[in-house]
UniProtKB/Swiss-Prot annotation:
It is found in: Cell inner membrane. The gene is atpD. InterPro entries: AAA+_ATPase, ATP-synt_VA_C, ATP_synth_F1_bsu, ATPase_a/bsu_AS, ATPase_alpha/beta_chains, ATPase_F1/V1/A1_a/bsu_N, ATPase_F1/V1/A1_a/bsu_N_sf, ATPase_F1/V1/A1_a/bsu_nucl-bd. GO terms for cellular component: plasma membrane; proton-transporting ATP synthase complex. It comes from Burkholderia ambifaria (strain ATCC BAA-244 / DSM 16087 / CCUG 44356 / LMG 19182 / AMMD) (Burkholderia cepacia (strain AMMD)). F-type ATPases have 2 components, CF(1) - the catalytic core - and CF(0) - the membrane proton channel. CF(1) has five subunits: alpha(3), beta(3), gamma(1), delta(1), epsilon(1). CF(0) has three main subunits: a(1), b(2) and c(9-12). The alpha and beta chains form an alternating ring which encloses part of the gamma chain. CF(1) is attached to CF(0) by a central stalk formed by the gamma and epsilon chains, while a peripheral stalk is formed by the delta and b chains. ATP binds at G153, G154, A155, G156, V157, G158, K159, T160. SMART domains: AAA. This is ATP synthase subunit beta. It comes from the Bacteria.
């Protein structure tokens, strides 16, 4: 350690997770320097220089028992975490320390969690599709390899289950490395995820970083950066890596919690005034370069189901595909509860996905949109008042709606139905048959919770 690392300061004020520390005026710590409480492992991160040798810091850990006058040492460098292969198969906290009781992480390489985003000329956009095996996603909002995807939804509509199914389908097929950052979510889900990975023998290819909802705001604010730093290292080694974040909203919320304590004026709806900058700094680093790619899937909680709330609205602009989960669709018992009219993807372009896929997607959306427009008329006057064309549109739309449902592998224990992985070709073939009228003779319940269109035909035989 350098001489600067030995500089000592004293705590002068504690307000929750925000701690003020006084240092000699000639050796004030820099912004983002990590400070360590003498005699403990508690880390503080410098956020502001207040002048007269006083710095304002965020506490990365519980601030219980802290008091004025305690000694703090300056490490003179930002928080660094272990990266590389030794992190695979391990569960770590925000500082990269193992929390799985499996011994220390023997990594010789560490990396600061604060990095600059790659330069513009290093970026490498991709148009290659990533098949997920989930019909509604592959058809309506296909993912790009090396792209960024957001799963938007309110409380209890299935963000985490969708995320787990994507991990199940992509990470297992992918064969490369994955990093999972649990940001302010339930510890039980983190535990379930660990055992799910272990049972399917892919744990040795996954690094897990957790800062769950019982932890202080400093941990939740920085844990996404810790996970991202590990993913960036694999990318810079020339690998294609998957990066999962659950939940990006909690990252924003942690920023809101410390923002007022740092003395910033709240902005719209009480969010921090630096919301767009904080989100931009994180999202701009999640990108693919000429060396390797990061394909990222992020769950985004939508407060009170309001997509115009500043937090989800700020996230939208950074994503290549948005999967919007709808409470109305979930209430019909259709899972995954993806809204096919609200969800979008930049890959929906005939030059990228091909003419056939593009035309089927648009025809499916047109049919569903027509049904949405007719719903009020049906509710008031009934189906009999519709023209024959509209009756046909409604019948097909209801079949499409049910065919967009699918049993998940990760939900087998709850539903009792075996999960289905549907290849993209089968998805396109199935929806083409419905919009072309080849399934008009089948009852709509035959399409509910099946995989391919052939299964719908078999189910129809059993029903009749």
């Amino acid at each position: 350690m350098s001489t600067a690392a030995l500089v000592e300061g004293k705590i002068v004020q504690c307000i929750g997770a925000v701690i003020d520390v006084e240092f000699p005026r000639e050796s004030m710590p820099k912004i983002y320097d990590a400070l360590i409480l003498d005699g403990s492992e508690l880390t503080l991160e410098v956020q502001q220089q207040l002048g007269d040798g006083v710095v304002r810091t965020i506490c990365l850990g519980a601030s219980d028992g802290l008091r004025r006058g305690l000694t703090v040492k300056n490490t003179a460098k930002p928080i660094s975490v272990p990266v590389g292969k030794p992190t695979l198969g391990r569960i770590m906290d925000v500082l990269g320390r193992p929390i799985d009781e499996a011994g220390p992480i023997e990594s010789e390489v560490t990396r600061s969690i604060h990095q600059k985003a790659p330069a513009f000329d290093e970026l490498s956009p991709s148009t290659e599709l990533l098949e997920t095996g989930i019909k509604v996603i592959d058809l309506i909002c296909p993912f790009a390899k090396g792209g960024k995807v957001g799963l938007f939804g309110g409380a209890g509509v299935g963000k985490t289950v969708n995320m787990m199914e994507l991990i199940n389908n992509i990470a297992k097929e992918h064969g490369g490395y994955s990093v999972f950052a649990g940001v302010g979510e339930r510890t039980r889900e983190g535990n379930d995820f660990y055992h799910e990975m272990k049972d399917s023998n892919v744990l040795d290819k996954v690094a897990l970083v957790y800062g769950q909802m019982n932890e202080p705001p400093g941990n939740r604010l920085r844990v996404a950066l810790t996970g991202l730093t590990m993913a960036e290292h694999f990318r810079d080694e020339g690998l294609d890596v998957l990066f999962f974040v659950d939940n990006i909203y909690r990252f924003t919320l942690a920023g809101t919690e410390v923002s007022a304590l740092l003395g910033r004026m709240p902005s719209a709806v009480g969010y921090q005034p630096t919301l767009a900058e904080e989100m931009g700094k994180l999202q701009e680093r999640i990108t693919s370069t000429k060396k390797g790619s990061i394909t990222s899937v992020q769950a985004v909680y939508v407060p009170a189901d309001d997509l115009t709330d500043p937090s989800p609205a700020t996230t939208f602009g950074h994503l290549d595909a948005t999967v919007v989960l709808s409470r109305d669709i979930a209430s019909l018992g259709i899972y995954p509860a993806v809204d096919p009219l609200d969800s979008t993807s930049r890959q929906i372009d005939p030059n990228v996905i091909g003419e056939e896929h593009y035309s089927i997607t648009r025809r499916v959306q047109q049919t569903l949109q027509r049904y949405k427009e007719l719903r009020d008329i049906i509710a008031i006057l009934g189906m009999d008042e519709l023209s024959p064309e509209d009756k046909l549109s409604v019948a097909r739309a209801r079949k499409i709606q049910r065919f967009l449902s699918q049993p998940f592998h990760v939900a087998e224990v709850f539903t009792g139905s075996p999960g289905k992985y549907v290849p993209l070709k089968e998805t396109i073939r199935g929806f083409k048959m419905i919009v072309d009228g080849e399934c008009d003779h089948l009852p709509e319940q035959a399409f509910y919770m099946v995989g391919t269109i052939d299964e719908a035909f078999e189910k129809a035989k059993k029903i009749s």
